[in-house]
Amino acid sequence: MTESQQQPVFVIEKIYVKDLSLEIPHAPRIFLEREAPEINFQLATSHNAVDGEIHEVVVTATVTARLKEKDQVMFLVEAHQTGIFRIGNVPGDEVEPVLSVLCPNILFPYLRETISDTVTRAGFPPVILNPVNFEAIYHQKKQQETAGEQPDQPADTITRH
């Protein structure tokens, strides 16, 4: 085998928005409100093999802005930021961390920009998503699997208020 055949391969083939939706159920009246909304942020990751060394990784965010006093949704935006990655010459037990940690870390800044841009274009102040520690989420998931626990929600899903 030549040296190039033994080197790990990691290539970003494509980064794109697979799905994007925005709902403003109480428009246009909601734009007259002065109350600061409560922001709820949910994040999930998934991945699947497409073909051989090609993998699809999806980071999904759902952001809901709600007026607490009136119990009204100002807006709800959901985005599926997706990447196609080529991963080769990597030991089998190391592929999962690449798909669960490295790839979501690459996709998250794009997702953050998509959410912020969509919300701003809808006429609201931008929503800035805080950084996410995908490594901690991955290790938590592995610990739960080792302990045989069934979490209330998948370990690769987080909710923030």
From Swiss-Prot:
Pfam families: SecB
Signal peptide: none
GO cellular component, one term: cytoplasm
Keywords associated with the record: Chaperone, Cytoplasm, Protein transport, Translocation, Transport
Stretches assigned to coiled coil: none
Main location: cytoplasm
UniProt key word Heme: no
Origin: domain of life: Bacteria
Sample GO molecular function, one term: unfolded protein binding
One GO biological process term: protein tetramerization
Region (Disordered): 141-161
Subunit structure: Homotetramer, a dimer of dimers. One homotetramer interacts with 1 SecA dimer.
Purpose of the protein: One of the proteins required for the normal export of preproteins out of the cell cytoplasm. It is a molecular chaperone that binds to a subset of precursor proteins, maintaining them in a translocation-competent state. It also specifically binds to its receptor SecA.
Protein name: Protein-export protein SecB
Organism: Nitrosomonas europaea (strain ATCC 19718 / CIP 103999 / KCTC 2705 / NBRC 14298)
Gene: secB
